[in-house]
């Protein structure tokens, strides 16, 4: 027989964490003042009057470096719990973590050889 009452805390947390953002959006939509005008439609540049066009194009190189950074940053976050409990997990989990690290490394070597990470 399944003991579903063990998951009551999980379901309560899930419902509370779903209701709070919805309530926050609803309350801010009701209480926020509605103001329309040229000030609302202009772009914000650190409190000074905007100069020139706000829509400028960025090179795709910025996005490539940002994506590589995010991939390795998320990988580091996922590897931290493994590193904390490394001594009790065993060799099998070590091999899995090695494969987990190897996949982004192979991907970045591929991108490097294709010239996606060249800044010129």
UniProtKB/Swiss-Prot annotation:
Cellular component aspect of the GO annotation: chloroplast thylakoid membrane; NADH dehydrogenase complex
GO MF annotation: an example: quinone binding
EC number assigned by the record: 7.1.1.-
One Pfam family here: Oxidored_q4
Protein's UniProt keywords contain tRNA-binding: no
Segments traversing the membrane: 9-29, 64-84, 88-108
Task of the protein: NDH shuttles electrons from NAD(P)H:plastoquinone, via FMN and iron-sulfur (Fe-S) centers, to quinones in the photosynthetic chain and possibly in a chloroplast respiratory chain. The immediate electron acceptor for the enzyme in this species is believed to be plastoquinone. Couples the redox reaction to proton translocation, and thus conserves the redox energy in a proton gradient.
Family: Belongs to the complex I subunit 3 family.
HAMAP family tied to this protein: NDH1_NuoA
PANTHER family named in the record: NADH-UBIQUINONE OXIDOREDUCTASE CHAIN 3
Subunit relationships: NDH is composed of at least 16 different subunits, 5 of which are encoded in the nucleus.
Protein name in the entry: NAD(P)H-quinone oxidoreductase subunit 3, chloroplastic
Organism: Nymphaea alba
Gene: ndhC
